[in-house]
């Protein structure tokens, strides 16, 4: 009769062994099978995105005479209307992401926009130290480069939601030039500076295939006689075609505003690029 209680105890211990192994890997019992992570933007260790970007561009530009007296300014120009620069672009954009351990991410992106125009001036234009007369044919160009490095740490991370912030660094370069070939007059100004930004990164996995993500970088500063702000925002809805390939549609906007008074290159510029994006993303 004592055989049955012993058999019952053995069966009970056998049923409890997998649970014990799950809680205590050193117990010697077999470990439960490891569950592989489901592919998603939250579990990707690396990705490269190639996007087609069609932004509308709005540019306000003013270049004042060097060392001018107070109250003396150049002519404020709408670059698209007054100088004939294109108001819409068709661009390719590349972005990389490297995940550093579980919560850290480094995003690398690059954007450039070179525009030129050739148009007769409707009014007299004071551009730096030169004055271009109405009716003259003016050649102008604005070249823009932005290379960004953004590190974020996810202070909240789950299977469905990830939110992080950190520090960004953008290397910006701009060059603007204007010329009237008939009068052999020309004026050019350029600037290149690194700027730190405050980023915010957000990802929401709606389902196993759909996800929404957004990230933004922002900075505003005033140093001596110069002041400016920079904003870079991107959002997208992603469809995961297979574990390593996704397609997405989204919206991107970049804004730059800079004003400087006095010195050799005083003036102001404000640019905005905003429009839809479609992209393909390879990840693992």
Predicted features along the sequence, with ranges:
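N-terminal signal peptide c-region/cleavage motif recognized by signal peptidases
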Residues: 14-16
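Outer-membrane beta-barrel transmembrane domain signature
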Residues: 170-243, 254-257, 284
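Short glycine/proline- and aromatic-enriched beta-strand/turn motifs that initiate or cap beta-hairpins
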Residues: 20-113, 275-277, 281-283
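Extracellular/periplasm-exposed beta-strand and loop segments of Gram-negative cell-envelope proteins
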Residues: 58-89, 112-145, 171-192, 221-224, ...
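Residues on the lipid-exposed face of transmembrane beta-strands in outer-membrane beta-barrel proteins
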Residues: 50, 94-98, 108, 149-153, ...
């Amino acid at each position: 009769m004592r055989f049955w209680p012993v058999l019952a105890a053995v069966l009970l211990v056998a049923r409890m062994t997998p649970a014990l192994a799950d809680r205590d890997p050193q117990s010697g019992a077999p470990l439960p099978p490891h569950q592989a992570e489901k592919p998603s933007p939250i579990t990707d260790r690396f990705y490269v995105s190639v996007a087609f970007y069609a932004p509308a561009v709005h540019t306000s530009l003013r270049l004042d005479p060097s060392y001018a007296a107070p109250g003396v300014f150049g002519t404020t120009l709408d670059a698209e209307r007054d100088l004939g620069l294109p108001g819409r672009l068709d661009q390719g954009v590349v972005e990389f992401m490297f995940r550093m351990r579980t919560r850290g991410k480094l995003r690398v992106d690059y954007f450039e926009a070179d525009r030129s125009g050739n148009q007769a001036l409707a009014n007299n234009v004071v551009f730096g130290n030169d004055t271009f007369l109405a009716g003259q044919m003016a050649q102008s160009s604005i070249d823009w480069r932005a290379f960004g490095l953004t590190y974020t740490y996810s202070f909240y991370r789950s299977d469905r939601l990830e939110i992080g912030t950190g520090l960004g660094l953008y290397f910006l370069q701009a060059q603007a030039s204007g010329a009237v070939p008939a009068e052999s007059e020309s004026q050019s100004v350029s600037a290149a500076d690194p700027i730190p930004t405050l980023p915010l990164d957000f990802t929401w996995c709606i389902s196993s295939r759909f996800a929404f993500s957004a990230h933004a970088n922002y900075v505003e500063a005033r140093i001596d006689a110069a002041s400016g702000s920079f904003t870079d925002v991107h959002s997208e809805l992603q469809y995961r075609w297979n574990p390593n390939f996704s397609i997405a549609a989204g919206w991107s906007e970049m804004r730059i505003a800079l004003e400087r008074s006095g010195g050799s290159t005083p003036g102001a510029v404000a640019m905005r690029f905003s429009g839809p994006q479609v992209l393909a993303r390879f990840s693992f």
